[in-house]
Amino acid sequence: VDNILPWFALKSIPGIGDLLYKRLIDRFNSPKLVFEATRENLVEVEGITPRLAVAIKKPKIGDSVKKDLDLVRRKRYKIVTMTDTEYPPLLLQIPDPPPFLYVLGRLNGSIKNIAVVGSRNATRYGISTTRRLCHDLVKFKMTIASGMAVGIDSAAHEG
């Protein structure tokens, strides 16, 4: 789990969305090497401003990163990063793929998948319905994918 800390830490920096994340990985190959890069090398990446380079050089491991790591440990999720061979190749073809996926079970390109995305401020009804729906979909051998955000996304994996 500790080797994913740099992945989570980079994702937690304000201003680093999926597009910039991919550009950084394309340039430096891993978050660890991103953090080791000089400010000068960082600003060579399209979209990285001097201010953002400073933020990258001084990351703050906040509560959200600690909560994500705790969730991975408790639920025993496997984290598949965009540099892993298991990462779905089609996802890498979009401009802003998620840098990593939370996986329960195994990834298989021939399995039917459904993505669940929703509000972080979901109602009880929304969370309950999402859990029931996803529970039923799994019975039909569907793979549930989400960003694992609080709310509907995480409820999808609780069903």
Tell what function each PLM region has.
Residues V1-K139:
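Short, positively charged patches
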Residues C134, V138-G159:
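Phosphate/pyrophosphate-binding betaalpha-module
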